[in-house]
């Protein structure tokens, strides 16, 4: 398997993880020793479905990279992966940790937030996009997948 195909596979898996993360619980607020869930939010609700847009762009960039678009699609995938990691770490992670900032903490003394599966999906998806972009950039300006360079 050449670098471009490996990069494409990683990128498509990453895009799928990002789409799944948007519809999966990113955090839930529980109260009391019985762990009663007072509120929960999906990844999309928490950051405005931004990662759906990233996933679409990742697929488009992957297709461009497979067609031999040079290093630019790979570098753009690295940037998209970095954006995903910033959203996960700067937007979603604090919401999974800060019980004192929760509206429920005013009404319930023992309210606390905990991370859902979406945070992990976002982190893995972001790392995979960075890796895919690096591989695609390393593959660089060779012949597109499925075509052989002209001999002569």
Q: Model-found features: residue ranges?
A:
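Compact integral membrane and secretory-pathway proteins
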Residues: 1-152
